[in-house]
């Protein structure tokens, strides 16, 4: 005879087995939001195109997977940026147009900036204004500027400058000495304002892929 206790344990196991997927789904973020997770600021934005699923992991870890996306930006870091040294490690596996970068904003002036460590099949520098180079953390980076006209920003729809450093030797782990880039930008008249958030971002545009990154 099967005991009641055996049936109870089996029933609990079955409930747990069915509960786990829903618990996982609760941790998946698919709509634009910002917040704090395990001591780190996180930001996820999507224009709603395709399928994009973002997950906050332990400490500074996050993962994101996307399929035929429209446009999205995601990542973990700090609510207030600075000239800190940023460590990152993990995997970045895009199919199409995607970026892995230190990403942030400043105000007064309003600036969106990228220190790009890796990218998919498109180097965005092709459509920007080349300003020079900086050598940092084992590679040469090409410096670019680009003006965004009437585009979304942390201050609403606005016209603002983008500053870019694009690494010539791609990587998915290492240390980014942000001060080297900020100083190089300033030497070309590319000045930052008061820092808003600063993250290690995975960004995709009309592409598919996955990324799992830990920030510290």
Curated annotation (Swiss-Prot):
Keywords from the named record: Carbohydrate metabolism, Glycosidase, Hydrolase, Polysaccharide degradation, Secreted, Signal, Virulence, Xylan degradation
Q: Which reaction does it catalyse?
A: Endohydrolysis of (1->4)-beta-D-xylosidic linkages in xylans
Task: Please provide, in alphabetical order, the Gene Ontology terms of the cellular component aspect for this entry.
Answer: extracellular region
PROSITE patterns registered for this protein in UniProt:
GH11_1, GH11_2, GH11_3
Describe which pathway this protein belongs to, using the record's wording.
Glycan degradation; xylan degradation
Catalytic site positions: 112, 203
Q: Which SUPFAM superfamilies match?
A: Concanavalin A-like lectins/glucanases (SSF49899)
Compartments (UniProt record): Secreted
Q: What Pfam families does the database record attribute to this sequence?
A: Glyco_hydro_11
Gene Ontology MF term list: endo-1,4-beta-xylanase activity
Question: Where in this chain does the record put each GH11 domain?
Answer: 28-216
Which BP terms in the Gene Ontology apply to this protein?
xylan catabolic process
Which InterPro entries does the entry mention?
Answer: ConA-like_dom_sf (IPR013320), GH11/12 (IPR013319), GH11_AS_1 (IPR018208), GH11_AS_2 (IPR033119), GH11_dom (IPR033123), Glyco_hydro_11 (IPR001137)
Cleavable signal peptide: 1-19
In short, the EC number is 3.2.1.8
Q: What biological function has been recorded for the protein in this entry?
A: Endo-1,4-beta-xylanase involved in the hydrolysis of xylan, a major structural heterogeneous polysaccharide found in plant biomass representing the second most abundant polysaccharide in the biosphere, after cellulose. Acts as a pathogen-associated molecular pattern (PAMP) that can trigger plant cell death. Triggers a series of immune responses in citrus fruit and enhanced the resistance of citrus and other fruit against fungal pathogens.
The record's comment on protein family reads: Belongs to the glycosyl hydrolase 11 (cellulase G) family.
> What is the name of this protein?
Ethylene-inducing xylanase
């Amino acid at each position: 005879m099967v005991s009641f206790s055996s049936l109870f344990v089996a029933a609990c196991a079955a409930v747990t087995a069915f509960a786990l997927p829903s618990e996982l789904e609760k941790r998946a973020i698919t709509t634009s939001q910002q917040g704090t997770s395990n001591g780190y600021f996180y930001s996820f934005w999507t224009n709603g195109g395709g399928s994009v699923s973002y997950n906050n992991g332990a400490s500074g870890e996050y993962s994101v997977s996307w399929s035929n996306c429209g446009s999205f930006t995601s990542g973990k870091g700090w609510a207030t940026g600075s000239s800190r040294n940023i460590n990152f490690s993990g995997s970045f596996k895009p199919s199409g147009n995607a970026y892995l970068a230190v990403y942030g904003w400043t105000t007064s002036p309003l600036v969106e900036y990228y220190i790009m460590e890796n990218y998919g099949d498109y180097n965005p520098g092709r459509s920007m204004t080349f300003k020079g180079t900086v050598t940092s953390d084992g590679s040469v980076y090409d410096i670019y500027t680009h003006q965004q006209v009437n585009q979304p920003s942390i201050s609403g729809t606005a016209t603002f400058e983008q500053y870019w450093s694009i690494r010539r030797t791609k990587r998915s782990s290492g240390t980014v000495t942000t001060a080297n880039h900020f100083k190089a930008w300033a030497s070309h008249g590319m000045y930052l304002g008061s820092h808003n958030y600063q993250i290690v971002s995975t960004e995709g545009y009309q592409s598919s892929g996955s990324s799992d990154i830990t920030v510290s």
